[in-house]
Amino acid sequence: MEKLTATIIALNEERRLAACLESLRGVADEVVVVDSYSTDHTVAICHDYGCRVTQRHFDGFGAQRQYATSLASHRYILSIDADEVLSPALRESIIRLKEQGFAHRVYAISRLNFYCGYPVKHCGWYPDLQIRLFDKRYANWNLHDVGEKVIFRDSVRPEPVDGD
């Protein structure tokens, strides 16, 4: 079975982080959190879930994500925000990919956006495909301060993954 590292960048995420980490159980073999010196209980929650935590001053979203990727022990990276939760369908899809072996270098995941607590599945907001699962030997984050994206070393077509 393939191994997978989940990477998270965080700052003062104590209210949302536990749900994110709970959704990673049984999916991620390692969770790396790069914390930007939170002043709440973010780091303690990470330790409670067995995450590997490093603190680093924030110097842009792309740089933080790229640094988190560099700390990963495994080839395949699942980059997730601290306020995001894997759906049961996405969990099953990723577990199946791990069991069968990753056949692609880069995967696109549908992001379900919420507005005022309600999911938005119309007006072009869904599926909001995001490159979040990739082989770090062939892809990594650009260094944009905001609007960061995964860039590839060669021309690959992201494979969609079921679930959001």
Predicted regions and their residues:
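A conserved acidic beta->alpha catalytic loop
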Residues: 23, 27, 33-44, 81
